[in-house]
């Protein structure tokens, strides 16, 4: 598989989306790009995304510390990734990594079609795994965990002709059992949702946190995120730490319900599907 060729002057610099210097690159995560506004927390507008790309594609002054570059990623595989985000990425000259739910492609409305994923790969973007059905990996039985990891990897590799070496953990949830399973399945990179945990390696798996991009994040907020001052970083760390404490107190399942309420998520407003939903879906097209 060829390397992504990213402009060397861009804030999004990376020789490869995965071979970035340890701890030296911020990773941004988008979900849906929408033509207009939405109450959904991760529903970023097309105009907003275009402004973000303008910032990321322009030469940026580096602070004395050397600054940070940014890797653009998408989670879920919403069809807006192709219809709205892909054309804007092509215009900007930037590349992204799309972590998609292999079990939903070509089967469920609002998800990518395989033909669309192939077009993005052909244009130099990467498509990697977000699991098979968006089940929280920490809540899976050993057999279901293996299915989520290996089935998605094999499906993506077979359909797209790519090497799948990275996975974005649904909900950002992971633990040592998940890391072990990822290693057995042949992954090399595991992305989660805590950007303040130092990049590390366990059992041959590189662990990397990411910043979730929300609908409230304008260009100035993005700039501060990528090049934060000490006070801003302390505030962001405190806020994320508070969220993690609430999650630990409530447990994954109850916290997920709480998150859905906070994020204004409801069916059709983002992507949360279970294996049985996919098993009962009759709309699969093997040639889409």
Residue positions per predicted region:
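Surface-exposed cleft-lining segments at the edges of enzyme active sites
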Residues: 102-105, 134-142
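Short beta-strand and adjacent tight-turn residues that come in two discontinuous sequence segments
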Residues: 99, 130, 192
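C-terminal active-site subregion of NodB/CE4 polysaccharide deacetylases
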Residues: 2-73, 78-83, 139-146, 150-165, ...
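Active-site glycine- and acidic-residue-rich loops that bind
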Residues: 76, 105-110
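Acidic (Asp/Glu)-rich catalytic clusters
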Residues: 20-22, 57, 86-94, 112-129
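Conserved SAM-binding loop
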Residues: 94, 135-137, 157
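Histidine-centered divalent metal-coordination motifs
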Residues: 31, 128-130, 134
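A short alpha/beta connector and helix-capping loop motif
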Residues: 80-102
């Amino acid at each position: 598989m060829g390397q992504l060729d990213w402009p060397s002057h861009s804030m999004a610099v990376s020789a490869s989306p995965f071979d970035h210097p340890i701890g030296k690159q911020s990773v941004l995560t988008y979900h849906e790009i929408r033509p207009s506004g939405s109450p959904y927390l991760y529903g970023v507008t097309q105009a907003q995304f275009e402004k973000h790309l303008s910032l990321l594609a322009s030469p940026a002054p580096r602070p004395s510390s050397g600054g940070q570059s940014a890797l653009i990623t998408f989670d879920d595989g919403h069809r807006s990734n192709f219809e709205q985000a892909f054309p804007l990425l092509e215009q900007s000259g930037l590349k992204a990594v799309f972590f998609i739910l292999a079990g939903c492609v070509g089967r469920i409305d609002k998800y990518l079609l395989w033909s669309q994923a192939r077009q993005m790969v052909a244009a130099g973007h990467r498509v990697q795994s977000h699991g098979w059905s968006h089940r929280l990996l920490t809540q899976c039985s050993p057999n279901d965990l293996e299915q989520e990891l290996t089935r998605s990897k094999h499906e993506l590799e077979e359909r797209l002709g790519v090497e799948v070496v990275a996975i974005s953990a649904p909900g950002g949830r992971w633990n040592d059992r998940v890391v072990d399973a990822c290693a057995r399945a042949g992954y090399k990179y595991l992305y989660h949702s805590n950007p303040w945990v130092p990049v590390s390696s366990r059992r041959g798996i590189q662990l990397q946190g990411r910043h979730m991009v929300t609908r409230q994040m304008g260009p100035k907020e993005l700039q501060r995120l990528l090049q934060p001052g000490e006070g801003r970083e302390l505030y962001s760390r405190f806020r994320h730490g508070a969220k993690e404490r609430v999650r630990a107190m409530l447990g994954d399942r109850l916290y997920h319900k709480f998150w859905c309420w906070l994020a204004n998520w409801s069916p059709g407003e983002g992507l949360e599907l279970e294996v049985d939903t996919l098993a009962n879906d009759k709309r699969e097209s093997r040639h889409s």
